[in-house]
Amino acid sequence: MGKSIGIDLGTTNSCVAVLEGGDPVVIPNAEGERTTPSVVAFDRKSGERLVGQLARRQAVTNPERTVYSIKRFMGRRYNDVKQEAERVGYQVVPGPHGDVRVRLGDKDYSPPEISAMILQKLKRDAEDYLGEEVTDAVITVPAYFEDAQRQATKDAGRIAGLNVKRIINEPTAAALAYGLDKENDQTILVFDLGGGTFDVSILELGDGVFEVKATSGNNHLGGDDFDAKVVEWIVEEFKKAEGIDLSRDKMAMQRLVEAAEKAKKELSSTTSTNINLPFITADANGPKHLDLTLTRAQFNKLTADLVEATAGPVRQAMQDAGLKPGDVDQVILVGGSTRIPAVQEKVKELTGKEPHKGINPDEVVAIGAAIQAGVLAGEVKDVLLLDVTPLSLGIETKGGVFTKLIERNTTIPTRKSEIFTTAEDNQQSVEIKVYQGEREIAAHNKLIGNFQLVGIPPAPRGVPQIEVTFDIDANGILNVGAKDLGTGKEQKITITASSGLSDQEIEQMVRDAEAHAEEDRRKREEAEIRNNADNLVYSVERSLKEVDGKVDSSTREEIEKAIKEAKEALAGDDIEEIKRKQEALMSASHKLSQVLYQQAQEQQQSGSSGGSSDEDVVEDAEIVDEEDEEKRDDNR
């Protein structure tokens, strides 16, 4: 059995951690960084897949084939994300089931496929760091993620070749990381503002039990929205100054997105920042340059509505938990966007507490996931995690009413059954429509699945007894069953999004991902072979110059021929040919090594036979301490 890791699959950045000797450790990626950009790109010319920092670096020149913030589209229907789709540089299109697809060149990818590419890199980097295979993972999701979004995340893990042992909520993971070594009972509020989502969770910690009392949030609020406000401001300012609308230029917009994010980060530690983008566009008069100054006060004004939008979920979570601000012992900030000073001030205003800043908001969620992975693997003892379902779940009953079976903030796993009956005489089937939400009318909530129970014997309405059972597992994923108690006939479904991927699609994606992983390994091996051959050519050429005139002409010709053939092979694409020519050059260079060795021996012998002159021999020496030296200096 391989190693188990904890993964924070973020909107902007992702992070992976592992337990080593009982302590959680953040795993650096291949580039040496502790977080990896959640960005995937395909090179326009070669089609090569790039993930992480490499993908982010080329985003400006390749905006249509660079995918970022894919988490915003996970488990969502196309009609629900049209506004978000307009804000990204890549093409978002409807899929075959009304779901979301990303069109890159001539191929459409599902959001779980793109996320799987990020997970594959995290898995590979973890394996390189640990020196062993990674098979299992605990992956985090926003607490307010719906059932379909959780299922999509699990699908992404499966496509990446990971056995997803558990899906846990990000605020809960943060609390786990914070509270593992705390002995006293505490009530904590986790304020999690990431790149694309916002969550608030209230937990009680005591005796190794982490119990979530309430959770609330907004899946459409995050750092991306703050960046978008700055981008809108830049576009307007440039339009006023130059009369040019940059929003129509995809390459320029990608530069603006990066500049906006940079400005946002800088304004967390300084009161003003300069946004300088030379050659942003051009008109008939020549190139145009963008040079603007954004102050923190202006930024706060631009984003005031976003900061205010965090207040509602905080108050809702407190109300659901039956708490007043004074009942909260500690406030933990999670997510890079909590570094924004106005956000921190808002948290202080809402809770009356100075937020705890002793943990890295970019890493704490992955650390918590690694601890939970350790709990599931038996490496961490005496820790119990009790999470909750974020939204109420129920079915549509007569008159379009939403009848709740499981209330929001119910501890999971949980199971609930209720008896229903038919609405019409001689009704022989019932359609069970499953909804998620808080509205009284079913149609105002989100339909997450439906199925038919057939074969009910004809009877007057109200006579048949149909037992409907809702079962939520520890991942927050729902199973629904309906049973006719009269006949024993039963129908069950696991709720996946109506826009979800089928098992066949996932299996195909797993095979594609494995093929890509093999392709990546092969490319790495090919690069190593090329590098080794190139280094050999360089060192043999240099050595040949060093022994100029000391190698007979036939040996020189043989080596020069081998060098020439190796260079020709390196110019081509045949890796086997490169290997053959490298071996031939290695063999030819052995004679050169003999000459160099012989030359070194001769130099050594001539050096030792020369001996030493009397002037070089030290017969006696006087040792003088510092005080005597000072006296001598004074006497001079």
Swiss-Prot record:
Modified residues (Phosphothreonine): T197
Classification via Gene3D superfamilies: 1.20.1270.10, 3.30.420.40, Actin, Chain A, domain 4, Substrate Binding Domain Of DNAk, Chain A, domain 1
Induction: By stress conditions e.g. heat shock.
Chain segments carrying region Disordered: 596-636
Biased segments, Acidic residues type: 613-636
Alphabetized UniProt keyword annotations: ATP-binding, Chaperone, Nucleotide-binding, Phosphoprotein, Stress response
Comp. bias (Low complexity): 596-607
Pfam families reported in the protein's UniProt record: HSP70 (PF00012)
Family: Belongs to the heat shock protein 70 family.
Task of the protein: Acts as a chaperone.
HAMAP family: DnaK
PANTHER family linked to this entry: HEAT SHOCK PROTEIN 70KDA
Protein name, as recorded: Chaperone protein DnaK
